[in-house]
């Protein structure tokens, strides 16, 4: 009973409900489906003719359950046999007889279990059984109707005319008929499953996709797969019929295909198919409002001769009203008998009231008075034809009620308002997201045509401000639709509520996690003033390496930037994938290049939104008053104050840097050099957006995101920001406001990745330069431009060999060589090589301010190149050595405004082992800015030394503290020379442990490097009082020294 496999195919649009959702609503019930269920418990009695009331009790219990939830039940019973279903009924009758005989045989053998199964299959619900139930319903004053023929068509008619709000059944044929709301599998507690026909367009599962289907295609698919009116062809199931209709979109084309491919396809099958389709649309039903016999959908005025009997070709007999109703004429004369013989309206009404047998037309009980009314008519919904636009597949409703007379048959042309079965020519059309399937409950005449109403699913698109053209949509191999836009905003965007906030919001199509910000953009491009460059759209692309698998929810990683003149954005929507989109924003004066890499909604603290730290005024971005956090100056505010402490040689070095970089950074090479200090760089006069094309690995400068790369030998372009930039970064790059974000996060080992959650990405300082004015007397050390392998790439190359190499000869400025950690010294020069930084993807967990991020185990090894986590890298498929080798060789930038100052050791570092405030045996050595006073207080009981470093600023903030657990090396400074002295093991408990010994491999040798100053012993510096950035800075300058002193 029903369409095999249809309900599982529609499971994506099946909703679990409870009948209380239909409280105070009218719900029709397929009476025979509940009678069959009730008969299972007493199948033996029913088959053998033993009187029983079990099936009635079952039915009444369900009715009372609905009433208890204030649902108004309307029971519909089957009527007489339908001629078009004659073969099916004969087959069922034969099967029931077979199972009846089997059940009796099992019963004689004593096999009651098998006998009970056979009895259940042999049960036949008769009109007499229905009449016994009707009498109970009358007593309960429950509404009911008996259909003239099939209850399915009667239920559908009540649904589409607004007499009931939903249908409870177990027969999937209701979907093919076109009922609007169908409830399946209801249990005795009222829980059930609901399918709405209007939702079928979004059904997509296991090869089924009904997005561009209509009601006609759905009905014909069900008929091809096999239904009660027509068996299917051999090998023709639901999925095969779906594919044929999906491909050809017209039943005539399907038949032409079947004639070529199927040997068992015949002309007789084709004719029976059209009869079945006609029966689904025009089966005879009873109208409870007008109390006449009518058809489910109005009959066409001209009927195809194939539907008429040879004995009678009168096309208007029995249809005097022109709407399918009989008009009281009982002479059917064989006219369309397969949809149900025409009967008098008086007989049809008696059948509907349950007075006479629908098969024999005999009265059930002559002693019973006639019921006056068993159904409460409801206002009919207006009937209006629906035409189908083959180009757009959109809703088009025609309110003209007289269009029924304009429907043509299949003998000629199509009517402009609709097309009937054999003349419906659907235009071949590809998938369109706007083509959604729906069915309006008040539009019943859609069954006359091959059309249906459709809802529209709109996708977020960007319109060109000039011609309002929709931007191109590209679909990748994973099936996700992306809209690749490249915008240039001519006008500065201001928010009405917060003029100090500018943020880019990623709009998702259907989605769950949207990055919340203080300032949101309106989707109207006219107000945003967005102009799209077609040349930029062609070169827009998304990296495969920018995707990261997510298990539970879809997220969006986005990089948001402050801007007052130019903004670039990109939107994406995907499932169980995370797209990292990195764009660059620039203000013409501030020149801060920033990038945040968020993990998709797991950061809710205020430090994440960097907008709060800026105030926008014209083209200037200035720090806001709320840059102070927890009583201390944030990293951004602190470093902004450092511009008052610029080195004396800053301007001269900056000029030399600009001149050297301007010659090498021409517009055709693809390089965009970022200098600080002056803005005299030729490529950086406007601070605007320029386009850069990758030519080779030696001709590019990589930013925080690798903006230039090649795919399949093709050039790709991206937007780079040419600007003068200062060496401070926004505090939003770290969730810890006290952390000095000028530290390059790419140097964090993967072994301490668990403690590295609060750093969203690298600090965006492309300079691996630690010019500390406080520790080294503000001496800017200059190195020649020939030091090609200095910088982070050379640092990586040298550190790998420093683990095992013995002390070697001093390095030269032009070709640095690998040397051990004990043989390198600092000369009076500073290496200012700028390196390409890269994006570290934040771990999937959230650290707190008390987490081990504030401490670092000295057992970790900085010399191990494995700390560059391939998973953390945004280009996970590339090797880390290759990345830095290609990026760092030719990109040397002299940056003289690096305010990477070592900060005061704060008392808030509670995890500091050996708290020196409570240990009077420790020797405290304070180095001021001039490094002239070195106070050494040696204690015989303890050799531990604590070095506190003061910066030029009186402001202090938290820095990362190193907690050593092994024999630690102290660093002292005397006349700008570094010495290393052995230390005893500190009695401290490590916060974190790792197999890599970081400090011991950098400062593993107890030997001193360089001569002592005259008249003063070396002053040891304890690593315990230094930040991680300071330690790495010292070690970096050691390894980069051109000539060690022994």
Curated annotation (Swiss-Prot):
This is Exonuclease 1. Mg(2+) 1 binds at residues 30, 78, 150, 152. Its EC number is 3.1.-.-. It is an enzyme of class 3 (hydrolase). Pfam families: XPG_I (PF00867), XPG_N (PF00752). It comes from Dictyostelium discoideum. GO terms for biological process: DNA double-strand break processing; DNA repair; double-strand break repair via homologous recombination; regulation of protein localization to chromatin. Binds 2 magnesium ions per subunit. They probably participate in the reaction catalyzed by the enzyme. May bind an additional third magnesium ion after substrate binding.
